[in-house]
């Protein structure tokens, strides 16, 4: 991290002080640059090309050194379009890696890979910047205690709990509620943990990025009236941008998150949507740099690139970065090298189900498909573990009986199975929950449910104490007391 002087005078005053090279070759987003002997820039240094194209338009392209080729040549990858660049143009070595603004000034704003604001809300305070390439925290700095990161979302906390400083994979197709779940997590971390969030849009559609921004403004996650009170910083490297930008935008978002963890000592949520596009961009860059492709055409450095990003996402003694990563699975093939490499780093998976979304059960988290390494008695305690297992067993039995119910009806089941089905349907509905960020759409106030309350609620359903209550009393409520109150209201309405 660097604290820059308030008056940003010219970084280099005379031509002698500059390290200037010239473009020798341009192949798409890849440039070869020749520097004077003995003045070669380091790997990952940022190079800046400034000048005018043949029509007289101003050009300002930032590149990152990827290879030293020998004969005073370096190969660099551009972070923006290379249209208008010509051979012989001057290239200035900044003598440092790409650096981006960090700290409170980033909240409520949208940035590109270079840390430049792209939301037309004016400049950002760049007195505090940080290089995007950093080492992962040393072993001695890590917080080795396994603790649960309480989200306030019942289905997540009970059945697939997140680890504080862990990495979670979010699987789901279009329209099943990924964005709303992400926004609720951003809202809850700010409310319950006093934390902030950073959203890294890696290869997202421009429309999706815009929709997310608008929805965050509507739900209050981004405060338009007082931008400093916002709870999230957004960093976008969209689909239409060169592979260099898409490959590095994840690191830009991570660098902003690291500052909140290390300097502000906060709990941070880092969203990466989509981690597959990070791998895909790396694959494109690898081919452009002339490396021999590996399995299925991916880059030979796939594990290294993934590791260098994932190892920086962790808990230290100061604070934590808990990362939620949307994972696209190409052709639904889980053995594809991209998702397979991602799985090795994940502590939990949250799978969103289209079937549940169709039933109107939100969040549409699949209780049987979602997993977590944290769901062990020695970590969460016997009570939590037992309750979660019994909930899963009840739902699994209901799933097995559904074919029989569809053909023969409920009446053909044994008394015991009918009771299981009734409880499973109550559990299924009780796993739904009204969200704070959806208040503006649904009209029902959001609910944050603590872990102890969640466990108590499901224990009461499993024990049979609430068998007499109607199913709809459990739908879209917070804790179990609200369900019993709702049942009494429904009873009163009938009379």
UniProtKB/Swiss-Prot annotation:
<protein>
    <recommendedName>
        <fullName>ATP synthase subunit beta, chloroplastic</fullName>
        <ecNumber>7.1.2.2</ecNumber>
    </recommendedName>
</protein>
<keyword id="KW-0934">Plastid</keyword>
<keyword id="KW-0066">ATP synthesis</keyword>
<dbReference type="GO" id="GO:0042776">
    <property type="term" value="P:proton motive force-driven mitochondrial ATP synthesis"/>
</dbReference>
<dbReference type="Pfam" id="PF02874">
    <property type="entry name" value="ATP-synt_ab_N"/>
</dbReference>
<dbReference type="InterPro" id="IPR055190">
    <property type="entry name" value="ATP-synt_VA_C"/>
</dbReference>
<dbReference type="InterPro" id="IPR027417">
    <property type="entry name" value="P-loop_NTPase"/>
</dbReference>
<comment type="subunit">
    <text>F-type ATPases have 2 components, CF(1) - the catalytic core - and CF(0) - the membrane proton channel. CF(1) has five subunits: alpha(3), beta(3), gamma(1), delta(1), epsilon(1). CF(0) has four main subunits: a(1), b(1), b'(1) and c(9-12).</text>
</comment>
<keyword id="KW-0813">Transport</keyword>
<dbReference type="GO" id="GO:0009535">
    <property type="term" value="C:chloroplast thylakoid membrane"/>
</dbReference>
<comment type="function">
    <text>Produces ATP from ADP in the presence of a proton gradient across the membrane. The catalytic sites are hosted primarily by the beta subunits.</text>
</comment>
<dbReference type="InterPro" id="IPR003593">
    <property type="entry name" value="AAA+_ATPase"/>
</dbReference>
<comment type="similarity">
    <text>Belongs to the ATPase alpha/beta chains family.</text>
</comment>
<keyword id="KW-0406">Ion transport</keyword>
<dbReference type="GO" id="GO:0045259">
    <property type="term" value="C:proton-transporting ATP synthase complex"/>
</dbReference>
<dbReference type="InterPro" id="IPR004100">
    <property type="entry name" value="ATPase_F1/V1/A1_a/bsu_N"/>
</dbReference>
<keyword id="KW-0375">Hydrogen ion transport</keyword>
<dbReference type="Pfam" id="PF22919">
    <property type="entry name" value="ATP-synt_VA_C"/>
</dbReference>
<dbReference type="InterPro" id="IPR020003">
    <property type="entry name" value="ATPase_a/bsu_AS"/>
</dbReference>
<dbReference type="InterPro" id="IPR036121">
    <property type="entry name" value="ATPase_F1/V1/A1_a/bsu_N_sf"/>
</dbReference>
<feature type="binding site">
    <location>
        <begin position="172"/>
        <end position="179"/>
    </location>
    <ligand>
        <name>ATP</name>
    </ligand>
</feature>
<dbReference type="InterPro" id="IPR024034">
    <property type="entry name" value="ATPase_F1/V1_b/a_C"/>
</dbReference>
<keyword id="KW-0547">Nucleotide-binding</keyword>
<dbReference type="InterPro" id="IPR050053">
    <property type="entry name" value="ATPase_alpha/beta_chains"/>
</dbReference>
<keyword id="KW-0139">CF(1)</keyword>
<dbReference type="GO" id="GO:0016887">
    <property type="term" value="F:ATP hydrolysis activity"/>
</dbReference>
<dbReference type="GO" id="GO:0046933">
    <property type="term" value="F:proton-transporting ATP synthase activity, rotational mechanism"/>
</dbReference>
<dbReference type="InterPro" id="IPR000194">
    <property type="entry name" value="ATPase_F1/V1/A1_a/bsu_nucl-bd"/>
</dbReference>
<dbReference type="Pfam" id="PF00006">
    <property type="entry name" value="ATP-synt_ab"/>
</dbReference>
<keyword id="KW-0067">ATP-binding</keyword>
<dbReference type="GO" id="GO:0005524">
    <property type="term" value="F:ATP binding"/>
</dbReference>
<keyword id="KW-1278">Translocase</keyword>
<dbReference type="GO" id="GO:0005739">
    <property type="term" value="C:mitochondrion"/>
</dbReference>
<keyword id="KW-0472">Membrane</keyword>
<keyword id="KW-0150">Chloroplast</keyword>
<keyword id="KW-0793">Thylakoid</keyword>
<dbReference type="InterPro" id="IPR005722">
    <property type="entry name" value="ATP_synth_F1_bsu"/>
</dbReference>
């Amino acid at each position: 991290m660097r604290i820059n002087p308030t008056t940003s005078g010219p970084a280099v005053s005379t031509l002698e002080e500059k390290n200037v090279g010239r473009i020798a070759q341009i192949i798409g987003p890849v440039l070869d640059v020749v520097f004077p002997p003995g003045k070669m820039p380091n790997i990952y240094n940022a190079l800046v090309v400034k000048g005018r194209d043949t029509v007289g338009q101003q050009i300002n392209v930032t590149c990152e050194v990827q290879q030293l080729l020998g004969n005073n040549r370096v190969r660099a990858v551009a972070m923006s379009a290379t249209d208008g660049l010509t051979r012989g143009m001057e290239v200035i070595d900044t003598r440092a890696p790409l650096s981006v603004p960090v700290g409170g000034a980033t909240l409520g704003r949208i940035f590109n890979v270079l840390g430049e604001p792209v939301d037309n809300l004016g400049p950002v305070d760049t007195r505090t910047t940080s290089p995007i390439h950093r080492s992962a925290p040393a072993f001695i700095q890590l917080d080795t205690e396994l603790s649960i990161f309480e989200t306030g979302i019942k289905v997540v906390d009970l059945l697939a709990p997140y680890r504080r400083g862990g990495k979670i994979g979010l699987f789901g197709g279009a329209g099943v509620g990924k964005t709303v779940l992400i926004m609720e997590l951003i809202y809850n971390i700010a409310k319950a943990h006093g934390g902030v969030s950073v959203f890294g849009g890696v290869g997202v559609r421009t429309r999706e990025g815009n929709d997310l921004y608008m929805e965050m403004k509507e739900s209050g996650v981004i405060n338009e009236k007082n931008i400093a009170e916002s709870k999230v910083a957004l960093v976008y490297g969209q689909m239409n941008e060169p592979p260099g930008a898409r490959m590095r935008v994840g690191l830009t978002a991570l660098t902003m998150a690291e500052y909140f963890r290390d300097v502000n000592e906060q709990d941070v949520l880092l969203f990466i949507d989509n981690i597959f596009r990070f791998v895909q961009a790396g694959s494109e860059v690898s081919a452009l740099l002339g490396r021999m492709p590996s399995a299925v055409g991916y880059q030979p450095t796939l594990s290294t690139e993934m590791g260098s990003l994932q190892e920086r996402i962790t808990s230290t003694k100061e604070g934590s970065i808990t990362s939620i990563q949307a994972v696209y699975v190409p052709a639904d093939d889980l053995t594809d090298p991209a998702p397979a490499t991602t799985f090795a780093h994940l502590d939990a998976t949250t799978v969103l189900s289209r079937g549940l979304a169709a039933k109107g059960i939100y969040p549409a988290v699949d209780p049987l498909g979602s997993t977590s390494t944290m769901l062990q008695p020695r970590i969460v305690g016997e009570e939590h573990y037992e309750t979660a297992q019994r909930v899963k067993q009840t739902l699994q039995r209901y799933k097995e009986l559904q074919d029989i119910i569809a053909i023969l009806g409920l009446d053909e089941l044994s008394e015991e199975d009918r009771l299981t089905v009734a409880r499973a349907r109550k559990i299924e509905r009780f796993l739904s929950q009204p969200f704070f960020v959806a208040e503006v759409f649904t009209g029902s106030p959001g609910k944050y449910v603590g872990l102890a309350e969640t466990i108590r609620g499901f224990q009461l359903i499993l024990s049979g104490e609430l068998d007499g209550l109607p199913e709809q009393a459990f739908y879209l409520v917070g804790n179990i007391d609200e369900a019993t109150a709702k049942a009494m209201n429904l009873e009163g309405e009938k009379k």
